[in-house]
Every structure is written in C-alpha cells, then in structure tokens.
C-alpha cells in the first residue's frame, strides 16, 4: 500500500530538456531526500533506474499514443507488461470512459489481477462517473489525474471552488483517493490532505524547471 503523504511525479517526455532515465533517477533521489513517500514515473526504463536509486514505492505508467484513441496512459496490455517487468508497486492507467485502442478497461483490470496479483492498480479519472466506475471495477486507488485534461473536462482545474470536484469524488467512492493534477503549491497540498485524500501526486511544480521558469517570466509579461 502507498503511504500517506507526498508522491512526486518524476517524468520528462522526449521533447523535454530533462528526458533521461539517469536524470529522472536523480530527480527521484532529490524528492526522496526532501521527504517524498513515493514516486510516479513513466516508462519501464525510468522506473528501473529510479528503483536502483531510491527505496520508495513507484506508481508506474507508460505514455504511448495510439491512432483513433485519446487514451495514452497505460492504454493496452503491452504497456501493462512493460510495467510488470519494471516491478513497480502500483500500475496506473487511464480509467476514463473514452474509446480505448485495444482491450476494455474491465479486461485490463482482470489482466493485471491475473498476471501481477501483488501489484496495486490506480485509476486516472476525469469525472465523478468515471471514479464510480473505477470503484466498481475494484481499483485500489482513484486519482483525479485527468480532470481538466480530457476533451469533456478541458479548462477545469482541480483547485477550483475549493477543490469541489475532489470533494465530490471523495463522497462518491470508498476507494483510496489520490489528488493529482494542478496541486501546485504547498498550501494546495495541505488542503487536499486535510480534505481526506490518501496521498497527493505533485509533478510540474517540483520537477519541471522549464515550466517553473516560464511562470516566473510570464508574471512580468502579463
């Protein structure tokens, strides 16, 4: 089980300056030394490098685009197999109701339970309906990761209306809820923990210096 506390997302896509499994392992080490209780990471290669560097539970994902589908976070059994090989403690996958490129969500959950019975599963959702569906399927954790990042939730931010969407999710499911997406300040982190989430994933506000720099620059341009 993931501990209560701060999970730091250590990810850099191929077009980003810090794209490197070695760099992500050092980012994870910095997060560990700062008090993080877990890491969220993308790709088998990054996860293996991170697990060689820090003794923290890892939420693993594989981001891969597929034609004719907007689902890209651990979309098929191919990505699941890569994550099983990485020996991450938790596999996270897109649990939205969008069209998937291959297996159904139900089939993927069954696949993970069969092939990796000791690995926990996290649902990345965008709506309360999707959270309820994930709970029905028996996900161990339900994360607000994709709220604001789907075509039908675009423009919505997790912290709007004092985290009302997060409150709605917490009231709708019995599973452990993870706050993720637009938790961008220590005060926001404290607020979501006070609301009763199991843990919170923070990424860009900690591990994406390019984006952090842009925020400083843009404040003078606005």
UniProtKB/Swiss-Prot annotation:
The keyword Isomerase applies. Signal peptide: none annotated. The gene is nanE. Converts N-acetylmannosamine-6-phosphate (ManNAc-6-P) to N-acetylglucosamine-6-phosphate (GlcNAc-6-P). It holds the Pfam family NanE. It catalyses: an N-acyl-D-glucosamine 6-phosphate = an N-acyl-D-mannosamine 6-phosphate. This is Putative N-acetylmannosamine-6-phosphate 2-epimerase. GO terms for molecular function: N-acylglucosamine-6-phosphate 2-epimerase activity. CDD domains: NanE. Pathway: Amino-sugar metabolism; N-acetylneuraminate degradation; D-fructose 6-phosphate from N-acetylneuraminate: step 3/5. Belongs to the NanE family. It comes from Staphylococcus aureus (strain NCTC 8325 / PS 47). Its EC number is 5.1.3.9. Keywords: Carbohydrate metabolism, Isomerase. Gene3D superfamilies: Aldolase class I. One of its GO terms (cellular component) is cytosol. The lineage of its organism: Bacteria, Bacillati, Bacillota, Bacilli, Bacillales. GO terms for biological process: carbohydrate metabolic process; N-acetylmannosamine catabolic process; N-acetylneuraminate catabolic process.
